[in-house]
Amino acid sequence: MRFTMEEIISFTETWIVKGDLNPDMLADDFQFISPFWKSNNKAVFLEKFLDPTEYVRLSLSNITKFDPYLNFKGLDGKHFSMILQYFTKNGSNVWEAVLGKVENGMLVELRSIYDLEATKKAHGLK
């Protein structure tokens, strides 16, 4: 199954803000890179995020709103980015950039960039 860039961006946004992951968009060689969640291949990523319980508990349950949430498509038709700021229950806010790479209608890489210490503080983690 292959997806358009717009579909992959939409699926990725849904996963980020709701925890609902569409595993069909992930290429066999998919890689996820994140300061908190570490680097994961497809199998490890699915193990962590297909069931959203831990992601919701550690992250989403603390977020009160996303504002702004901006999506951009690369001119090359292979890359996209999401720039977002979220606010948490303890009054903190975090800026995050999410970079995606698409090949042959499948997501091959997702890289999340943010200040790890600010993120831990925002979520009340040590």
Where are these regions (language model features)?
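C-terminal and inter-domain tail/linker signature
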Residues: M1-K126
